[in-house]
Regions:
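Active-site core of glycosidic bond-cleaving carbohydrate-active enzymes
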Residues: 1-80, 86-175
Length: 175
């Protein structure tokens, strides 16, 4: 479980805020680009889970198999923590987003140019070199789970249509 171990030196990689995210399921908003750190971590966790499953399938040693399967389930469950970042408070899919959260679980509202409200066009803040539009469907490890969050396959298709048909007007450091 080294991917769940807090590192003192992130110069050559690692994960930010593991001392907190291991317990609350995401990197909190007091860390710049927190949302992206969280989402990348979930994808990494899914990869680690798949590796553990493969190792379990290849060994005949019962103890090793049990340990690998324990790792598999641990990381597979962590990979699904993206659901903690889903904001379903909108009336329809056009106003539902994957967003950054604060340590207390409340949504981060300070990603706009005046830091007073959520703006899905805002490039940066919670997001690394992107915005809420680009990250709204960035869950390659669990497409069915993502569709369920939006309300089903048709609603996920509607969200994709919204992303593809909304005019860019991005703002922030990448806009």
């Amino acid at each position: 479980r080294n991917a769940a171990t807090v590192s003192d030196n992130l110069t050559n990689g690692g994960r930010k805020k593991l001392n907190i995210s291991n317990f609350i399921g995401y990197v909190p908003a007091d860390e710049n680009e927190n949302f992206s750190w969280s989402m990348e971590g979930y994808i990494n966790d899914y990869g680690i889970a798949q590796m553990a499953k493969k190792l379990a399938d290849q060994t005949n040693d019962a103890t090793k198999k049990a340990n690998y399967m324990s790792e598999y389930y641990y990381y597979l469950n962590r990979a699904k923590n993206y659901s903690l970042l889903f904001d379903d408070s909108g009336q329809d899919v056009t106003s539902k987003w994957l967003r950054g959260r604060k340590t207390d679980g409340s949504l981060n509202l300070g990603n706009s140019d005046n830091n007073t409200g959520f703006n899905p066009f805002w490039w940066g803040a919670d997001y690394t070199e992107t915005n809420a539009f680009n990250m709204a469907v960035s869950v390659p490890q669990d497409g069915i789970g993502l569709a369920n969050l939006y309300g089903g396959r048709d609603q996920l298709a509607d969200k994709l249509d919204t992303i593809f048909t909304t005019d860019g007007g991005y703002i922030g450091y990448g806009g």
